Amino acid sequence: MNHLQVIREDKQLRILLMQECDILFYDQFKEVEFSQNNEVYSLSHTAFAKDGSGGEYVILEDESIGFIGSEGQVGRVAESLDDLLTFLLHAGSISDFSCRLLYKNKELLAKFCQGFTNKIRENYQSKGEVWDKVRAGLAQELGLEFKPEKLQELALKFYQSAIRTPRFTCKYGHAEDEYVCDSILSDIIGLWVSDLVGMSREEIMNFSN
């Protein structure tokens, strides 16, 4: 967790990470904000950062990284802080890569990752910026690797962390009123996914079977 202290002590780096990777680091560890409804989490944890929507990143008891979303989704997202930061440097956020069906077919995931990279480069170019240069500079400050061609590999690592056991889950309520929080992986195929792979929802579903 060496990067944690470095980031906490560097205000400019924290601002850059929020702007580029949608992660705002807290000054210190804190209890998660989503603990007011008698939630029972499967693993002990402590919050160290949040995203723009209010979801929180937590360090789990095995030192892997979990995420508790503002819309009720819960799960593991990385095996270490370095892995999380490396993924975010390439992906920008975890939500864009949360569609479970993408990981059922390597060709489909490859198409999505290439489409994502092309689109994000276009977006930066429209602002007069070079995505590769911006992210490579941030990676250098963090002492981490930035290789866009490895996005598919990094996405698979994210997926594998999310599905491995013991899973990071949450439930609340009692008996018939007990509710289990959604996984961070979703079966929803958004327009974003369809646009990037150039396929309809039905085509994606057939492709992933």
Predicted regions and their residues:
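Compact, glycine/acidic-enriched structural inserts
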Residues: 71-107
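Eukaryote-specific, cytoplasm-facing alpha-helical/coiled-coil scaffolding segments in long proteins
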Residues: 111-113
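A surface-exposed partner-binding patch
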Residues: 1-72, 99-104, 116-209
